[in-house]
């Protein structure tokens, strides 16, 4: 037992000394050099284009029986003005309830297949086992093209968004985020405007429908499929579930020019109800 204990103490001392030695060699005043830039290898991906302008990439990998896809419409930022929040509200409603299924029914269908489906005004994604790829892709298309926009759901999402704004009224991080965008870009820029309770309440159901119609267009976008799926299978899915998606692109807006400040600025925000 004594011999074992001596060996244990010796090993512990060696480990401690190695640790001290390693720490002593680290110069924390110097920024460590970065490692090599990781390479993204898509050389085996097959590319083709649909008639509506959407670029499609297929990277087949049969290592696991799963498939995923992502849709990026490559939309430019949009200034929402006195209806700031319409993009968030549109995204909240998209894919929740469809012309075929209630909100709960749609969620149950996705969960039953052990899949993941999400759609927003700028694209979306899906993930599932290969054997369910057509079932899940049909649900993705249903969410993307057959969403049922209802006043009831819009009112609910407005309440949620307003509650979030109110909860951040005393948050230094939330306040700083709003001020930062406004100072950097100006309040008349997409990255500088502030969503308020007033602008949210200005958004109507027709505004949401129109925002979706104006933004969900394929011509500037691309779609990437990865996993256990072939080009032939992808083309079959797209032909069956996206054949009605007509070409169209989003106009790139013009924003007022802005210049960097010439001197350091300190910006203060008056918060009368702050505890400090």
Which residue stretches match the model-derived regions?
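Acidic/histidine-enriched segments that form metal/cofactor-coordinating
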Residues: 26-28, 33, 107-211, 256-257
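Bacterial N-terminal signal peptides
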Residues: 11-19
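Mature N-terminal segment immediately following signal peptide/propeptide cleavage
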Residues: 38-67
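M16/MPP (pitrilysin/insulinase) zinc-metallopeptidase core fold and M16-derived inactive scaffolds
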Residues: 70-130, 192-194
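Solvent-exposed coil/turn segments that connect beta secondary-structure elements
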Residues: 51, 55, 61-63, 72-76, ...
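Bacterial N-terminal signal peptides that target proteins for export
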Residues: 2-12
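Sec/Tat signal peptide C-region and signal peptidase I cleavage site
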Residues: 20-24
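An aromatic/glycine/proline-enriched structural segment found at the starts
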Residues: 25-33, 193, 222-276
